[in-house]
Amino acid sequence: MGLLDFLKSKKNTAETAKNRLQIIIAQERNHRGGPDYLPLMQRELLEVIKKYVNIDADAVRVDLVKDGEHDVLDISVALPEDGDK
């Protein structure tokens, strides 16, 4: 029984790794077609937000989304639940 549990956990780990890689690839595809200023904007937004809240670099996401005729700048900030500063 212990051996079966061990093998099952490896499958879950592999599935998790696969899902993470798919997310990274999708994000890279989104950034490839965007303007050159988006990465700089993301870093600057992170610096400003860090003045008020303690967050990781991965907490700020900036994407440019095409919505018909318009380009929409989508900014997502994952704030900590405890209001840490």
From Swiss-Prot:
Coiled coil: none annotated. GO terms for biological process: cell division; regulation of division septum assembly. The keyword Glycoprotein does not apply. It holds the Pfam family MinE. Keywords: Cell cycle, Cell division. It comes from the Bacteria. InterPro entries: MinE, MinE_sf. SUPFAM superfamilies: Cell division protein MinE topological specificity domain (SSF55229). Transmembrane segments: none annotated. Belongs to the MinE family. Prevents the cell division inhibition by proteins MinC and MinD at internal division sites while permitting inhibition at polar sites. This ensures cell division at the proper site by restricting the formation of a division septum at the midpoint of the long axis of the cell. This is Cell division topological specificity factor.
